[in-house]
């Protein structure tokens, strides 16, 4: 706490105030010098945080001497602006403004190491400015006490005033230890000045006391006579009943009208003890019938006057100390902010920008983690799709070799059949007269399907090109062992030791009749071409010339196979845009017999009559097309070896086919009926098939 070290006498306008000394105005007749000790602002004896101090020293060294001098200057506007925002008490704000104005006028080093210039500029001393450790202690040790000090001040809930600036403070209160506290903080000079009582002031206190307790006229006169004896106006020897021991320790100066009270603490405590009942409260009628009783009443009034004076000094000291601390901490806080802003300008980045950058970095890290998770999920889905539909197993060299083999096979087949046409892609469908299905291994690179199904030959395609009669509760057929696949030309069949009879028909739009299987396969092939390779719809195979060859193959006994009588139905594909024709026929030479092929061989084959006729009078040896197709269906459960995963994969990849399945069937039915009506006069079997199809 601040101490009272000196007294400003009247006429001493230019008192030599030292560092951290300010004047304390008690009343019109008393002004003391208030001093703050050095231990209040010890800049060297604090234990500082090593890491923070090191960082502050680094920031301090970044500033040049000129930049540091500019940073360590703040205006009164900045200080008073912070004052209005932080301090709610009106009395405190006025006191700080008054003290700052006094320091601007006087220029006293009251806030050292802070200095106040004549233009209202607050700055720091050169020694503190250049010492980084002292500056750190000032800014971050003492400067951090501002908010704590303001919060610790008790305030009134009504007007937000503190207790020191409240109106209730001026009311007399019971005696306490405050007078002893302020008495110990005074120097001897200040104590002598405090106990120097003015006679006029004591008389005012005495008159107030007499009115308060309603003294009668005689008693009042007795008290006034005792007061006059104290100030030396009356001779005490002439007064009857006067007790000189009561005025012991009191000395008067009649010329200066002063009363000097003994400075001993015990004597002061004795005088204040007389005044204690007065401050306890209550009014009562008092009497002073004798001079000695009147002397005691005068001593009581002297104690009251002395207590009020000490209480006023204590109040002024507390208020001025609080004002000085507020101004000092406000100045330190303003200088700290100015220093930090200057450092931020030098660094080129502010704390707010650093905070935003940290938030942005956290956001980028979070987005990167989410992107990694999305990439992992995408990779898992991609791997799953790759497992369902693996990559092609054939390299470019293998495909080239396969194309060469297919070309050689087509040429050999056409030469074997004696056909004069070019060796284009064709498929031979062998329909037996009994319950035998086509046993034709399909080419490995027929449609470029990369999947090899379980239980199939390595050369067969894993993609199912047939269709089921319903979406639910049925499985799609496979090309292997399928008559429809044989008629469509996407299967291969070549039994051991058998040569395929391959024929080719030129594409002619209006060229007579065509065979039933060729026309149907052409329609089906064109429909599937829309979904996969977008082939032209108008490429249908006209087989008028092929009908004659078919008839020759049927009637000529030399074209029959040795194992039984078979009918060769040849389907010819259209020419594609590709320069290399894709072969849908391949032979299985030198390989192990496949399961489905062995099953085909195990099916009993029955011979049919040597000559077949499509006429109505052909007899029992002639079978209709419906019977041939019905007999060609395989009913063995051993051939159903397509897995459920393959079925689901095929259904997922051919959704458009299933959605338009009914349209395809209706379109095929209309085309076939139209064909039968046009060729009814040539082939009676078409009439029978049309009747059967219409009934169905």
Curated annotation (Swiss-Prot):
Compartments where located: Cytoplasmic vesicle
Recorded GO CC terms: cytoplasm; cytoplasmic vesicle; nucleus
InterPro entries per the UniProt record, alphabetical: GGNBP2
Major subcellular location class: cytoplasm
Induction: By dioxin (2,3,7,8-Tetrachlorodibenzo-p-dioxin).
Keyword flag Phosphoprotein: yes
GO process annotations (BP): cell differentiation; labyrinthine layer blood vessel development; labyrinthine layer development; negative regulation of cell population proliferation; negative regulation of gene expression; negative regulation of receptor signaling pathway via STAT; spermatogenesis
Tissue specificity comment: Testis-specific.
Keywords: Cytoplasmic vesicle, Developmental protein, Differentiation, Phosphoprotein, Spermatogenesis
Modified residues (Phosphoserine): 360, 602
PANTHER family the record matches: GAMETOGENETIN-BINDING PROTEIN 2
Biological role stated in the UniProt entry: May be involved in spermatogenesis.
The protein's assembly and partners: Interacts with isoform 1 of GGN.
Stated name of the protein: Gametogenetin-binding protein 2
Organism: Mus musculus (Mouse)
Lineage: Eukaryota, Metazoa, Chordata, Craniata, Vertebrata
Gene name for this UniProt entry: Ggnbp2
């Amino acid at each position: 706490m601040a101490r009272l070290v000196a007294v400003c006498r009247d006429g001493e306008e230019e008192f030599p105030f030292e560092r951290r000394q300010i004047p304390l105005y008690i009343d019109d007749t008393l002004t003391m010098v208030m001093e703050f000790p050095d231990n209040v602002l010890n800049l060297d004896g604090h234990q500082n945080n090593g890491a923070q101090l090191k960082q502050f020293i680094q920031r301090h060294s970044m500033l040049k001497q000129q930049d540091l001098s500019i940073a360590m200057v703040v205006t009164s506007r900045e200080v008073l602006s912070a004052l209005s925002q932080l301090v709610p008490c009106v009395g405190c704000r006025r006191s700080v403004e008054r003290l700052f104005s006094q320091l601007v006028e006087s220029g006293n080093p009251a806030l050292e190491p802070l200095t106040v210039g004549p233009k209202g500029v607050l700055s720091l001393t050169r020694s503190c400015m250049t010492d980084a450790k002292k500056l750190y202690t000032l800014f971050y040790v003492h400067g951090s006490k501002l908010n704590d000090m303001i919060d610790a001040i008790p305030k009134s809930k009504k007007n937000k005033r503190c207790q020191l600036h409240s109106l209730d403070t001026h009311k007399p209160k019971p005696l306490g230890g405050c007078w002893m506290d302020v008495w110990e903080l005074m120097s001897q000079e200040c104590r002598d000045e405090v106990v120097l009582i003015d006679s006029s002031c004591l008389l005012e206190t005495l008159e107030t006391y007499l009115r308060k307790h309603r003294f009668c006229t005689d008693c009042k006169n007795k008290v006034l006579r005792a007061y006059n004896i104290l100030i030396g106006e009356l001779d005490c020897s002439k007064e009857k009943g006067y007790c000189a021991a009561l005025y012991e320790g009191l000395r008067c100066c009649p010329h200066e009208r002063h009363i000097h009270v003994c400075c001993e603490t015990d004597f002061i405590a004795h005088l204040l003890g007389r005044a204690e009942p007065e401050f306890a409260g209550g009014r009562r009628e008092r009497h002073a019938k004798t001079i000695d009783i009147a002397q005691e009443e005068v001593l009581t009034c002297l104690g009251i006057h002395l207590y009020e004076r000490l209480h006023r000094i204590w109040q002024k000291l507390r208020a001025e100390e609080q004002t000085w601390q507020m101004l000092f901490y406000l100045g330190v806080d303003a200088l700290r902010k100015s220093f930090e802003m200057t450092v931020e300008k030098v660094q080129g980045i502010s704390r707010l920008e650093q905070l935003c950058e940290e938030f942005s970095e956290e956001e980028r890290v979070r987005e990167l983690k989410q992107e990694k998770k999305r990439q992992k999920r995408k990779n898992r889905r991609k791997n799953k799709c790759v497992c369902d539909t693996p990559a092609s197993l054939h390299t470019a060299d293998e495909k080239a070799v396969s194309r060469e083999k297919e070309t050689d096979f087509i040429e050999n087949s056409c030469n074997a059949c004696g056909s004069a046409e070019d060796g284009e892609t064709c498929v031979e469908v062998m329909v037996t007269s009994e319950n035998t299905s086509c046993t034709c291994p399909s080419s490995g690179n027929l449609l470029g399907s990369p999947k090899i199904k379980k239980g199939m030959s390595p050369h067969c395609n894993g993609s199912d090109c047939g269709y089921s009669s319903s979406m639910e509760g049925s499985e799609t057929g496979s090309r292997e062992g399928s008559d429809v696949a044989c008629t469509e030309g996407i299967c291969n069949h070549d039994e051991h030791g058998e040569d395929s009879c391959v024929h080719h028909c030129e594409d002619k739009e209006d060229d007579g009749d065509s065979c039933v299987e060729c026309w149907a396969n052409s329609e089906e092939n064109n429909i599937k071409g829309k979904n996969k390779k977008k082939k032209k719809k108008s490429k249908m195979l006209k087989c008028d010339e092929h009908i004659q060859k078919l008839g020759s193959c049927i009637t000529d006994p030399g074209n029959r196979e040795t194992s039984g009588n078979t009918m060769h139905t040849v389907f010819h594909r259209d020419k594609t845009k590709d320069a290399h024709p894709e072969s849908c026929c391949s032979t299985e030479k030198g390989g192990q017999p496949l399961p489905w092929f062995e099953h085909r061989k195990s099916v009993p084959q029955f011979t049919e009559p040597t000559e077949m006729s499509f006429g109505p009078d052909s007899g029992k040896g002639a079978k209709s097309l419906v019977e041939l197709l019905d007999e060609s269906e395989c009913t063995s459960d051993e051939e159903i070896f397509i897995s459920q995963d393959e079925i689901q994969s095929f259904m997922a990849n051919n959704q458009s086919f299933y959605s338009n399945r009914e349209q395809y069937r209706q379109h095929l039915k209309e085309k076939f009926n139209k064909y039968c009506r046009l060729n009814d006069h040539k082939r009676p079997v078409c009439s029978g098939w049309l009747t059967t199809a219409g009934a169905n």
